[in-house]
């Protein structure tokens, strides 16, 4: 319908109050993961002459990434979920590994075919590696305020509030969040200004040898 994903999610959450905060976060994560992997999720159905729709994408996503904890056959007819899976759809999904093995490279790596030449020219030998990274959620990095604290103390403080981080070998002031990012804004470390969200690339810019205390940087 042309509505942005953010707007569609906002409207859905507004009209479906039964979805709590954890549910809303999980739904958002799944929706954006599906969008990143959209081409490969639809491909098995595309070559079987299906039209793309949200239901097909979700069924494919659940089958590929959630079948260890969830069975599509458990879906029953109700107003809160997808209609039960059809036999033909299940047959397609059961053969999904065979379809994926034969999929074109742009489908596997999730990019438009017409961009392949330019992407390979730009990325060179890193092409496959970079495109695979784009299929996953971007990592979340924190910058430590070294004037107020240090990496070790803040890593420990964050863990006490269920925010698990790891050190980043590329930066002396960065932590990478592994889990618990939903607790960050209410954490004491964030509220006190000991940490803030900042991309790793921006942090590395300030750590080059030519930069010294007191200098101003245009990021």
Where are these regions (language model features)?
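Conserved class I S-adenosyl-L-methionine
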Residues: 214-219
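Active-site-adjacent "gating/activation" loops or surface patches in catalytic cores
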Residues: 179-182, 195, 213
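Conserved hydrophobic/aromatic pocket- or pore-lining residues that grip, position, or stack substrates
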Residues: 142, 197, 205
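Class I Rossmann-like S-adenosyl-L-methionine
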Residues: 1-186
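Class I SAM-dependent methyltransferase Rossmann-like catalytic core
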Residues: 188-196
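Glycine-rich helix-loop-beta junction characteristic of Rossmann-like nucleotide cofactor-binding loops
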Residues: 187-188, 207-213
């Amino acid at each position: 319908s042309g509505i942005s994903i953010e707007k569609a999610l906002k409207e859905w959450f507004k009209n479906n109050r039964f979805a709590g905060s954890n549910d809303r976060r999980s739904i958002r994560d799944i929706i954006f993961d599906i969008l990143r992997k959209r081409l490969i999720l639809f491909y098995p159905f595309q070559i079987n002459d299906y039209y793309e729709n949200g239901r097909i994408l979700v069924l494919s996503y659940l089958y590929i990434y959630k079948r260890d904890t969830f069975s599509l056959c458990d879906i029953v007819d109700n107003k809160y979920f997808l209609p039960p899976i059809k036999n033909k759809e299940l047959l397609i999904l059961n053969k999904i590994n065979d379809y994926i093995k034969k999929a074109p490279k742009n489908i596997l790596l999730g990019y438009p075919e017409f961009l392949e030449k330019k992407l390979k020219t730009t990325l060179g030998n890193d092409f496959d590696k970079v495109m695979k990274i784009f299929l996953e959620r971007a990592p979340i990095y924190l910058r430590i305020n070294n004037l107020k604290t240090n990496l070790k103390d803040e890593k420990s403080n964050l863990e006490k509030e269920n925010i698990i981080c790891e050190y980043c070998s590329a930066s002396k002031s960065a932590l990478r969040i592994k889990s618990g990012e939903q607790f960050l804004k209410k954490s004491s470390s964030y509220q006190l200004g000991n940490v803030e969200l900042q991309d790793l690339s921006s942090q590395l810019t300030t750590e080059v040898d030519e930069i010294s205390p007191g200098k101003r940087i245009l990021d």
